[in-house]
Amino acid sequence: MAFSGSSRTLTQQSSAASTDDLHKILFSPEAIKEMATKCDLGRHHWLRADDAVCVRPLVPETTSNKVAQWFKTGYEAGKLPSKGYMIIPQVLCAVTRTVTSNAEGSLEIYLADLGDVELAPIDDQVVTLHNRDLPALISFQPTYDCPMEKVGDRSRCFAVVIKRHGYLGHPGSTASVCSNWQPKFSSKNNNYKPAAAGKTLVLPYNRLSELSGPSAVVRLLKSQLNMQSSPLFQLPGGPIMQKAIGSEREEGLNCKRKLPLEEVCTTSRDSVSSRPSVVNGIERPGTL
């Protein structure tokens, strides 16, 4: 059957059943699991001395082969205008160091095509980060869409390549890289205006700022009082409870807090006093 009409018309000829098959391939539990375990999508990857060069494909080979077969079947049946392309609009990577700031070392991160035997960077999509520059955010934008084809014994696909340099005396992890992207597949392809890889240095988080406000100081003092009498762990911003030594009761320092219904209990008539006799090791006068 010869092609007739536009490629859009040919694409629309694909049956709903075939489209459902493609959705099952892309969103099956196995595919989602492999995107995490084999591609590290949205996960933190630690760079160690024994993993100095890391290559992470942006689509698992199993999923890529199934998608390529789906497009090939539609192409040979005359329903699709091509054997399929993988489209990656952008790759974002958050990089943080996991060693002291004066450690001598650097990271080279770039986007590559697994169809290239030398695995060279694609159109200046490469960034070098020194340890002292971290943390940082980097971004990559491919200038073309990748054909769904076999090159030798592997599927052609975009990949993030990370190389660790230096860091003598640091055999463990020296940096953490968390990457995110959204692969798309289409029967059409395009070329894109070249844009250099982006690099944005991020100011380290100032966690001391949380302790500079008056309310933070009050919470700190109350937590210190609480720690002297009871090894309770208190979440930030929650009501702080004080436990008396030698007593099973707990008294809230914030008297305005309303107790939920399940915390309200009836005091026994045999009780001499509802207040503890000893608080923080100081005996309360007038108690038995």
Curated annotation (Swiss-Prot):
It is found in: Host cell junction, Host plasmodesma. Its main location: host cell. Keywords: Host cell junction, Transport, Viral movement protein. GO terms for cellular component: host cell plasmodesma. Pfam families: 3A. InterPro entries: MPV (IPR000603). The keyword Transport applies. GO terms for biological process: transport of virus in host, cell to cell. It comes from the Viruses. Transports viral genome to neighboring plant cells directly through plasmosdesmata, without any budding. The movement protein allows efficient cell to cell propagation, by bypassing the host cell wall barrier. Acts by forming a tubular structure at the host plasmodesmata, enlarging it enough to allow free passage of virion capsids. Belongs to the cucumovirus movement protein family. This is Movement protein. It comes from Peanut stunt virus (strain J) (PSV).
